[in-house]
Amino acid sequence: INWLKLGKKILGAL
């Protein structure tokens, strides 16, 4: 799992 990409997706959803 790519945590950096996942984090960016989460931040983008906020």
Swiss-Prot record:
Q: Which domain of life is it from?
A: Eukaryota
Q: Tell me a Gene Ontology molecular-function term this record carries.
A: toxin activity
Q: What is the annotated role of this protein in its UniProt record?
A: Antimicrobial peptide. Has activity against both Gram-positive and Gram-negative bacteria (B.subtilis (MIC=15.5 uM), E.coli (MIC=70 uM)). Shows mast cell degranulation activity (EC(50)=15-26 uM). Has moderate hemolytic activity (IC(50)=45 uM). Its mast cell degranulation activity may be related to the activation of G-protein coupled receptors in mast cells as well as interaction with other proteins located in cell endosomal membranes in the mast cells.
Q: Extra info from the record?
A: Most of synthetic analogs show a decreased antimicrobial and hemolytic activity.
GO process terms (BP): defense response to bacterium
Family note? Belongs to the MCD family. Mastoparan subfamily.
Q: Which residues carry this modification: Leucine amide?
A: 14
Tissue and organ distribution: Expressed by the venom gland.
User: Where is the protein localized?
Assistant: Secreted; Target cell membrane
UniProt keyword terms in alphabetical order: Amidation, Antibiotic, Antimicrobial, G-protein coupled receptor impairing toxin, Mast cell degranulation, Membrane, Secreted, Target cell membrane, Target membrane, Toxin
Can you name this protein? Mastoparan PDD-B
Q: Which GO terms describe its cellular component?
A: extracellular region; membrane; other organism cell membrane
